[in-house]
Amino acid sequence: MHHFNRAKKAKNNEFFTLIDEIENEVINYQKQFANKTIFCNCNDGKNSHFFQFFQTNFNQLQLKKLIGFSFNNLSQADKFTFDGNKVTKTKLKGNGDFSSDESIEVLKQADIVVTNPPFSLFQSFIDLLIQHNKQFLVLGLNAAVSYNHIFTYFKTNKLWFGYTVNKTMSFSVNSDYQLYNPKTSNFFTKNGKCFQKIAGISWFTNLGKPHYNPFLNTNCFYKNNEKNYPKFDWYDAIYVNKIKNIPMDWNGLMGVPLTFLNCYNPKQFELVDCLANPYATLDTLKTNAFVKLNQGDVRNVNGKRRYVRVIIKKQQI
């Protein structure tokens, strides 16, 4: 399959997702986009790399329509529509926020949402898409899986990871970007442009069918190695420090690293819960009230707080 055409010009006035990152993911779903209306509702209108990518590759993807909103917190924003021939600009009544009535009205007409929503609003953004039964392909922090609703959607197969998972991505930014600091390793310049590197970025989607990994086989066992698998202090599950150490002979609950979801196969393991803060995300074992009463933390093992853990259980095959 040949490469998509590149959008040649882009004003560097937003937190830009790079064209390469968009292309490398979209190429896996090319058939899904035929005769569809695409809505980019969290970007900078026609200046967005998302809008430019789909405009440039409109015919190759056989799109029906492309719509993008700009966002202006201080005044009226704009709506941009591309039908394959020309871009039409329309002034909005509001600021272009994805949760505004104007944006939701367009969302109802769209088939697929492709964008990079604000990370701090990721859960409410996905809630909105699920509520309106929309297909989507969006960027987010890998850690968002630990959020209550996101984990539930993951568990119930309403969303899954795309083909790019837990990657350190570079985003182009303005040199006057609020957090820009050329002295830190997170920022760098190339060909006169400024970029920021952000770790743990994944694509989230409900396009097509989830592509699951082969069954995991670690060659590790709980029997005769019990000391390597202590129990959580406040949660009835064993603690597993690394994915490669998941015991193949353990049929009970176990807490594994969040990155386990990168190699998750629902035919082999069941997602039970997530320990991402002092309390269990879904409170599957109904332990949260007791933990709160005693000022505990479900992540603790031998009194020491551990990192986020996904609670899983082997499927009975």
From Swiss-Prot:
<keyword id="KW-0238">DNA-binding</keyword>
<dbReference type="GO" id="GO:0009007">
    <property type="term" value="F:site-specific DNA-methyltransferase (adenine-specific) activity"/>
</dbReference>
<comment type="similarity">
    <text>Belongs to the N(4)/N(6)-methyltransferase family.</text>
</comment>
<keyword id="KW-0489">Methyltransferase</keyword>
<dbReference type="Pfam" id="PF13651">
    <property type="entry name" value="EcoRI_methylase"/>
</dbReference>
<dbReference type="GO" id="GO:0032259">
    <property type="term" value="P:methylation"/>
</dbReference>
<keyword id="KW-0949">S-adenosyl-L-methionine</keyword>
<dbReference type="InterPro" id="IPR025247">
    <property type="entry name" value="EcoRI-like_methylase"/>
</dbReference>
<dbReference type="InterPro" id="IPR002052">
    <property type="entry name" value="DNA_methylase_N6_adenine_CS"/>
</dbReference>
<keyword id="KW-0808">Transferase</keyword>
<dbReference type="GO" id="GO:0003677">
    <property type="term" value="F:DNA binding"/>
</dbReference>
<protein>
    <recommendedName>
        <fullName>Type II methyltransferase M.MgeORF184P</fullName>
        <ecNumber>2.1.1.72</ecNumber>
    </recommendedName>
</protein>
